[in-house]
Amino acid sequence: MSNGLPISIGRPCTHDSQRSLSAPDSRIHSGFNSLLDTDLPMVHSEGTSTPTQLLRHPNIWFGNLPPPPRRPQDNRDFSPLHPLVFPGHHSQLRHVHETQQVQQTCPGKLKLSGAEELPPAPQRQHSLPLHITRPSRFPHHFHARRPDVLPSVPDHGPVLTETKPRTSVRQPRSATRGPSFRPILLPKVVHVHDDPPHSSLRPRGSRSRQLQPTVRRPLLAPNQFHSPRQPPPLSDDPGILGPRPLAPHSTRDPPPRPITPGPSNTHDLRPLSVLPRTSPRRGLLPNPRRHRTSTGHIPPTTTSRPTGPPSRLQRPVHLYQSSPHTPNFRPSSIRKDALLQTGPRLGHLERLGQPANLRTSERSPPTKRRLPRSSEPNRLPKPLPEATLAPSYRHRRPYPLLPNPPAALPSIAYTSSRGKIHHSLPKGALPKEGAPPPPRRLPSPAPRPQLPLRDLGRTPGFPTPPKTPTRTPESRITASPTDIAPLDSDPVLSVRTEVHAPERRTFMDPEALRSALASLPSPPRSVGIIHTAPQTVLPANPPSPTRHLPPTSPPWILQSPVGEDAIVDSEDDSISSFHSHDFDSPSGPLRSQSPSRFRLHLRSPSTSSGIEPWSPASYDYGSAPDTD
């Protein structure tokens, strides 16, 4: 810079406290360069302060200050990191600053005029300056929020000594100690007129709207016999489906109305209403401002009330004009054929509704069942419901299965706990006449594989199945082997008898069988005869759940072979036990000591030697626990 201070670092700073650099005049410009022959560091790192004692020392080296940029600073290259004020703020160097060119001014203009201040107020709590006169209109002034702070001054003559007004440079704007300089003007009093009940709060403004007087109508006494007019119920509205169908062999009746207490003659006493009557001409509205004329002397035009719906009933769909005096109000577009009418308009006949001219007798009867009916003829009612036989699980029945004595048992109706059905009791199943022997339990070897029973046919007479000799470790009781010979009626089944035993046949009525089965405790299992094909071989698994009982059967035969050579076997080796409850016998429950084991053989039509072993079965008439 030509006339400014050169900026460089590397020379010590000299200090001269005798000279003053307060006035940058041209007369001292030559001595200013000789005084500051060394350059002053103009850069000071922010955040660090240099003590004054170090700055006054003549041989202080400022080596830790960052260097300035290489090029000289101008008005366009100014870095805020390099302040222009000397960090020491020495009294000798306080007017030294970096500039583009040192301005030469007159020494007479160096003195700055001090800012004028407010004159000290004689009283700090005075409200107004001294040169402002108080208006005579408001002699008393108080604080806006604290009126007790400012006492009123009665005489202001000796206080106002200065006549020339002075403009103050600074005036407080806040009114914390006193009110503002502007005099407080009270708002104008708004007179609220309380004479009218509903007066406007703005008396100077015009009313936006005025209440119009209503039409004068004579006051009518309320009628005690009629309720006020109510809208028709929704049930009277026919809607888009039209009116409801009529009763058979009857004319159209008016829609039902809510029953209201009233006299029989409704023409003389009508409900009084303030609303005007509807105009007789369609499409014209009555004039509400026209006064009504009394029509009490005019007789009614019609003596009978029309049977159609009232005129206030709105029909949203059937907007067709008809004759005014028809008793049956029907649109002219409704055709007589119900199917043609409901097809294109209402869709499905049963789903969407019925036409207006359809009687109830013409409608199809509602279906009671949605399931399709089979074309097979009606069969005889089955004696027992279709249900599965007893499932194959090993447990004891909690209820007696058959009644006691065995003579009262129905023939061909023996079932086991595993769901197998037997047509006859084996030899020794029935107890002998006399006192029943005590029950006993016999151990037995491991159970043998068991097969389901075959159908023994429906013929009443077939030979008694003889018994197969079996031995037990304890009893050593033997019996004859059991085979089934061919029946007279069914050539498929055959029974081969090796040892004949006395047998007993008991004929029972099917009705007695049904009554005996119905007397069993609930829940009983299905008991009956298995019907299978003649050549069908049943699997060795438990019986299938699709077994059914025959609807009718010939006279039942109860075949109970009785003999001395009864077979005694273990209950563990048996299929099931029959438990009976004594209903009529005084002897109580009976238990057979000779559970029987028998096998049934099926002979095919081609060969008669085919024998299939039957699973052993035991019959227990006592209440001893079953281990099977």
Curated annotation (Swiss-Prot):
Q: Which InterPro entries match?
A: 45/70kDa_tymovirus
Is DNA damage one of the keywords UniProt gives this record? no
Residue ranges annotated as compositionally biased, kind Polar residues, are 320-331
Which Pfam families does this one have? Tymo_45kd_70kd
Domain of life, source organism: Viruses
Bias (Pro residues) occurs at 434-450
Residue ranges for the region (Disordered) are: 1-25, 141-332, 346-404, 418-493, 535-628
* GO BP terms, alphabetized: symbiont-mediated suppression of host innate immune response
Low complexity bias: where?
299-312
Sorted keywords for this record are: Host-virus interaction, Inhibition of host innate immune response by virus, Suppressor of RNA silencing, Viral immunoevasion
The record describes the protein's role as: Acts as a suppressor of RNA-mediated gene silencing, also known as post-transcriptional gene silencing (PTGS), a mechanism of plant viral defense that limits the accumulation of viral RNAs.
The Swiss-Prot or TrEMBL record describes its family as follows: Belongs to the tymoviridae protein p69 family.
How is this protein named in the record? 69 kDa protein
Q: From which organism does this entry originate?
A: Turnip yellow mosaic virus
- Phylogenetic classification of the source organism: Viruses, Riboviria, Orthornavirae, Kitrinoviricota, Alsuviricetes
